[in-house]
């Protein structure tokens, strides 16, 4: 699994930056909430070297930051990252975040990569300013893992096989009744999330370390 992720990262990072350039890794999420702590935990495991200098100048390729959440800082995460990017001038940003799944089978089993950036909080209805090239000023590679799922999605996954003989109208009416119960505001996570998020973050950290320190 580590080798597979490393190859995915290599191919995507090459699109975002040339060799011997600086990359800024951003650990999004709330460290105090286990299911949302993926980003900070990944940054904890990184071998940052941007601060290392030799007689020939700066040799390090990777720097990292954990910007926290708006409830703690009062600031849009995108504004924090943009300010750092203006100072550091990275070739690209790698943003890591926990996601909301749209299928039970993808919980803690899927690592998603995108070169279009990310919108923090959008999976749970807490829309914030997007972290993308337009807002940050440099290309943004987003890396996420689904760690939570809303109760309505679980209900749909479970009852859909039972409704296969119903008409489209009947299915929509049944599902709308479930939705009106308010379960779409409930989010759940696997009971082994503590172990899962530690293992997943370790794999991602090591993959990034291998890619950026070749």
Residue ranges and their predicted role:
Residues 1-21:
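Extended, charged alpha/beta regions that create polyanion-binding interfaces
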Residues 3-4, 37, 41, 76-80, ...:
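Conserved active-site and cofactor/substrate-binding residues in soluble primary-metabolism enzymes
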Residues 6, 10, 40-47, 82, ...:
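Predominant activation on well-ordered alpha-helical scaffold segments within soluble catalytic domains
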Residues 22-33, 64-68:
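Short glycine-rich or small-residue beta-strand-to-loop segments that form or flank ligand, phosphate
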Residues 28-37, 71, 98-102:
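Gly/Ser/Thr-rich loops at beta-strand to alpha-helix junctions
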Residues 38-71:
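Anionic-ligand anchoring segments at beta-strand to alpha-helix junctions in alpha/beta enzyme folds, i.e.
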Residues 58-90:
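A structural-propensity feature for long, helix-poor, extended segments
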Residues 65-66, 95-214:
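A structural signal for small-residue-enriched, beta-sheet-centric alpha/beta enzyme cores
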């Amino acid at each position: 699994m580590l080798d597979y992720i490393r190859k995915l990262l290599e191919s995507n990072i090459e699109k975002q930056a040339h060799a011997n350039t600086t990359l800024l890794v951003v650990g999004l999420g709330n460290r105090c909430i286990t299911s949302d702590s993926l980003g900070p935990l990944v940054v904890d495991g990184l071998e940052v070297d941007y601060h290392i200098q030799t007689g020939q100048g700066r040799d390090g390729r990777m720097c990292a930051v954990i910007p926290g959440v708006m409830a703690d800082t009062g600031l849009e995460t995108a504004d924090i990252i943009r300010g750092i990017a203006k100072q550091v001038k990275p070739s690209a940003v790698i943003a890591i975040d926990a996601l909301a799944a749209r299928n039970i089978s993808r919980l803690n089993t899927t690592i998603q990569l995108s070169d279009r950036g990310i919108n923090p909080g959008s999976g749970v209805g807490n829309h914030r300013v997007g972290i993308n090239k337009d807002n940050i000023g440099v290309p943004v590679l987003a890396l996420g893992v689904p760690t939570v799922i809303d109760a309505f999605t679980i209900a749909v996954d479970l009852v859909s096989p039972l409704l296969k003989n119903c008409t489209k109208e009947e299915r929509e009416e049944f599902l709308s009744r479930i939705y009106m119960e308010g379960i779409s505001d409930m989010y759940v996570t696997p009971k082994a999330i503590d172990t899962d998020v530690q293992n997943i973050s370790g794999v991602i950290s090591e993959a990034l370390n291998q890619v950026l320190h070749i």
